Amino acid sequence: MEKYKEVFVFISAAVAAYFDTTITFVYALLIGFAFNVLAGLRADEVKITMTRFPNFGILNYRGDKLVDSLKELGLITFITYMIKAIVDLMKFDDKSAYAVQILIGIAIYYYLKNGLRNLTKAYPKVRWIRMLYYLVSFKFK
């Protein structure tokens, strides 16, 4: 059992070292994802009711959108790290971090634009959110 523990520690250290250079980009992607999901829940008028502390109910909620969004996040992360692995295999010196940075930046822009669109649906009278959405999505009237 001790041999397996050493192998597991070696493999986990190698994986952690590989993802260490780009983990902050993934954190930023997760923040953008959370903003998009929360804005989507607000746009769909999902209500959370508390009955007692451990129990709560969710009204007007379908889990299909959240599952699709989680699949999308997984696909974005998988494709990004697949491209990082390909660039690393081509032996470019630390250029794979730039590829990850650009791809995750595009994904964060998508999440920001979609979240602002959901917030304009949730708060149609707030002009600041609408103006920010038009500015981010390049839709000038």
Language-model-detected regions and their locations in the chain:
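Membrane-proximal cytosolic segments adjacent to transmembrane helices
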Residues: 1-6, 49, 53, 109-141
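Juxtamembrane helix-capping/reentrant segments at transmembrane boundaries
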Residues: 50-75
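Membrane-water interface of transmembrane alpha-helices
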Residues: 34-50
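Alpha-helical membrane-embedding segments
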Residues: 68-75, 85-89, 128-141
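Transmembrane helix interruption/hinge and helix-loop junction motifs
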Residues: 18-25
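Hydrophobic alpha-helical transmembrane segments of multi-pass integral membrane proteins
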Residues: 6-14, 30-32, 69-85, 101-111
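Membrane-water interface at transmembrane helix exits
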Residues: 39, 43-44, 80-88, 92, ...
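Internal alpha-helical transmembrane segments of multi-pass membrane proteins
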Residues: 91-103
